[in-house]
């Protein structure tokens, strides 16, 4: 017998007369998180391709008394490919389970569990790009080389404290494009693991200056800090608590999804299918999907890796 086929023996309680409901493991699922951070688009090709382009720099002074206009050209960087990957699984319910009318009781729950598994997979893959963004041959966070040859760092290594948040906000206000021109870019989201959720809330919503040390202590201060207004109050509109961030100290400051360059492409949104297996007379189910995720440029995202 195929070990992957669910049989009536796995659900002995269902054979009892009078059973009315079957409950699988129920848990409170987090709402969809990845779409709050990524620019989510739909693709109709095998892959998507994007190119980093820098426009013009400062316009030079020109002698209009018969001299030619100075020339400039756009700068281009590397092409970034988003190659879609397929994800899927199947499961089979035996004929006996169907015949005893047991499947009618658990079929819907099994399908919901499969949908939850797919949702979990999407979140896991999407957040791994951010969580692992400090490492690799092309890191998302670090000392980045601009197309004009200069450099700009979108990474810091400070705990989520007033000092750390101030440093991150200052870095945002010092943002330069690939031509070295200062650009106005506002932080939209403070992204934290569950361990920093209340630290983030204290920083952004307390009325008075937050007393938060490097260890995340939010106890009232005896130094008189409560007499100062909180300069960080509502500076960052949204706080996002993400359980897929495994490091309990790292945190991130992002611009709005339409501003930065993190991409999520749906090639095939999750879909389910079912048919009868003529060999076993059981019912086979499947769930599949295809997508790609990554980043084109580091613009508009900042990460703090705390050792």
Where are the language model's segments positioned?
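Structured alpha-helical segments in the cores of large, soluble enzyme domains
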Residues: 73-83, 167-179
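Conserved binding/catalytic microenvironments
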Residues: 91, 136-147
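Long, contiguous amphipathic alpha-helices that act as assembly "spine/axial" helices in icosahedral shell
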Residues: 79-136, 190, 285-287
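Short, well-ordered loop/turn elements at secondary-structure boundaries
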Residues: 76-77, 85-87, 179, 184-187, ...
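Sequence/fold signature of self-assembling virion shell proteins
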Residues: 2-11, 146-174, 186-189, 195-307
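N-terminal alpha-helical "arm" segments
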Residues: 1-28
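Intrinsically disordered or highly flexible coil/loop and linker segments, enriched in small
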Residues: 28, 32, 43, 123-127, ...
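Assembly/oligomerization interface modules of large self-assembling protein complexes
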Residues: 24-87
